Amino acid sequence: MINLIEEKKEAIKELCIRFNVRRLEIFGSAAAGSKFDDQKSDIDFLVEFGPLKTGEYADTYFGLLEALENLFNRHIDLVMPRAIKNPYFLKSINQNRKVLYAA
């Protein structure tokens, strides 16, 4: 896992609590630590939210996305596990995913 993530673990935890995150994982080059470009690479997160009221999902999802982009000052890909339909993509994610937060 890249140092940038390690340095911001406490801030990540605070965002997870604020946005009712049940589980947040990192995957991709930032998780693997290889081929991550400090200047250009995005960061890929897998997120599961706790129970939310109808109509709160969009605000919560986009609020967390914006907060993570502000925290890391770079593009963030925020993926929900149930949205993954491609088995090859899921296999790729599973090869290097790491838990950052679990409630």
For the regions a language model picked out, list residue spans one by one:
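Short hydrophobic/aromatic beta-strand micro-patches
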Residues: 46-48
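Catalytic core of pol beta-like nucleotidyltransferases
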Residues: 1-25, 31-38, 50-103
